[in-house]
Amino acid sequence: MSSPGRFGQMYAPLRVPNYRMFLAGQTVSTMGSLIQMTAQSWVVYELTHSSAALGTVAMLGSLPLLFLSPYAGTLADRIDRRKLLYGTQLILAGLAATLAILVQTGLIQLWHLYVLAVVTGIVTALDGPALQAFAADLTGPTLIRQAVSLNMMGFQVSRMVGPSVAGLLVGFYGSATAFWVNAASFLAVVLALLRVRFTNEGASGQRGARSGAGGGTTMDAVRHILGNANLVNFYIYPLLYMFGAASTMTLYPVYVGDVLHRDARALGTIVGAWGAGNLATSFLVLPLVQNVRRTGLLSAALLIWFGAMLALLWAISLPPVMASIEASGASLGLPDPVVLAACVATFLSGATGPIVLSMASGLQQMMAPPTMRARLAAIGTTITFGTQPFVNLAVGYTGEIFGAPTALLANGVFVTVLVLLLVTFRRSVRAEVIRPHTMVNPSQPGPAASAPDGGDRTPAPAHAPARAGGAPVSSAHA
């Protein structure tokens, strides 16, 4: 397929009005959440100047995902997802408003941030699987993978804009303003939910949830995953990426404050550059790799991320390098060359994320039976994000003891070694795995037709899952 054709295929879900409205609302809400995340990290830093405290807040916010996401996925497969999302979005808005009031009145203490992080994590654990499954309920089964990629684009737009806006809000108006903006942003999803009207094709997941068709257990979903080596890989890739990349975000306030000696606006700019790298890849590269056949690309993306993160470490943490950058930048008349160098490094490291996360998530969903989608989404959340509490805590304390640059370096080396071992010893990582997928009727489980390229047949499970919006089942094998 030509490049223009691939780009057109990529944006096909935008022709669905329901999905268009929901994507817009979700993007606004995500932007608000990232504004709050950046502002909250700065509040923690101002209160404590401690990497350990930053890691603890991040851990407490992520810990509920580990324990609750599997149950949340089962819940989202059994009840009306729209009603569940109404509740979670309004509660999250209330929590953001509470944080805004505490900061604005000067009453905020570290323990408040700990408690709010836990409660927000609990609600987010309930919200996530339903949000993912609901988005694909809107598109129908033929557009799942493209919808996942567009969701990723919306997230990257938010990631690029959100931290930068947070830096401006905190710098000019104070942290409380950022939290008020986040509280208001959840209303965008609520308004989108009010306007959504299902078509016959897009309502299958909702009908299954209301009728109890998604009545299997989490273990059914686990067995479905373990039965396909390629599907297992698509849970490993994002885990490795998030282990290496996302956990480093915990240390950025320390980098900016203690290493660069800059303020919240610089933090927003540097984190925003990470988002800009994500966004550039989402718009320019993702459409071209929709049909890539070898998952080694994902491992390569992780290795590229590691190289960029090393560049970030050397550019920011080594005094001789910083002095050289400042001298070179001054001779060229560049504004704040050290921050600019950090932005270049974070842009390059951020550029790998959409490839890893979008391809893995899209293929997880394509390999999911329709009535199990939310459970497979929840398992992905548990594996990828549920482990973050421990990683965040470990990275935070490593930064506290050895310094933030050393913590980032150790994390990058660890991830790279794991990726190399995976590529070396797991044959399915190097094999062709993305083949034309055949549609199966969820109500008529049976063997999928042979793929046009001669792909193997894969029997569809008798219990059809329900994740993000349709029911294509992959014929990929190890």
Locate predicted features:
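Helix-loop boundary and gating motifs at the non-cytosolic
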Residues: 3-64, 229-274
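Substrate-agnostic recognition of the 12-TM MFS/MFS-like secondary transporter fold
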Residues: 20-37, 61-74, 80-95, 112-171, ...
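C-terminal transmembrane bundle of multi-pass solute transporters/carriers
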Residues: 57, 67, 71, 84, ...
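Membrane-helix interface/capping residues of multi-pass secondary transporters
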Residues: 19, 51, 81, 110, ...
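Helix-loop junctions on the cytosolic side of multi-pass membrane transporters
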Residues: 106, 133, 137, 179-209, ...
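Small-residue-rich packing faces within the transmembrane alpha-helices of Major Facilitator Superfamily
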Residues: 62, 93-100, 156, 183, ...
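Juxtamembrane intracellular "pre-TM" segments in multi-pass secondary transporters
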Residues: 2-19, 199-236, 259, 441-450
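Transmembrane alpha-helix termini and helix-breaking/packing motifs in multi-pass membrane transporters
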Residues: 41-47, 100-105, 161-181, 258-259, ...
